[in-house]
């Protein structure tokens, strides 16, 4: 069964910021990044358990998981499973302070 993908509002800001950064670097890389994110999310919706659990807080329910964006391995999708939904919390560069950012989401 394929889960429904639910993006938290801040994810749109994440994607916009990353796409803007890539647009400044090279043409069409932003489009390739967005396509890679869409493909990754589709794959996670089919197999949500394939992401790595991230123990940000002991006993955290539901557990947050992560998955690298294919072809853009410095970027990570953070999500959790809630019933029949794959809830995406953030899409961030791996060098960002993930704990701090997710604490505020």
Predicted features by range, described:
Residues 1-36:
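Arg/Lys-rich, positively charged N-terminal/basic patches that mediate binding to nucleic acids
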Residues 7, 15, 41-44, 86-92:
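Generic leucine side-chain signal with a strong bias for well-ordered alpha-helical environments
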Residues 9, 34, 39-46, 105:
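Outer-membrane beta-barrel domain signature
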Residues 20, 27, 42, 46-50, ...:
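Generic structural signal for secondary-structure transition and capping sites
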Residues 31, 52-56, 100:
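Short, hydrophobic secondary-structure boundary micro-motifs
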Residues 46-84:
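Basic/aromatic recognition patch in beta-strand/loop cores that engages polyanionic ligands
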Residues 69-105:
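Enriched for short, Lys/Arg-rich terminal
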């Amino acid at each position: 069964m394929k889960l429904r993908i639910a993006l938290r509002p801040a994810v749109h800001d994440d994607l916009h910021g990353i796409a803007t950064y890539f647009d400044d670097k090279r043409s069409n890389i932003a489009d390739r990044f967005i396509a890679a994110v869409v493909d990754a999310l589709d794959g996670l919706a089919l197999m949500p358990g394939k992401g790595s659990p991230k123990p940000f807080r002991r006993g955290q329910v539901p557990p947050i998981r992560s998955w690298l964006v294919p072809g853009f391995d410095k970027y990570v999708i953070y999500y959790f499973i809630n019933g029949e939904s794959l809830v995406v919390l953030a899409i961030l560069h791996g060098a960002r302070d993930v704990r701090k950012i997710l604490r505020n989401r």
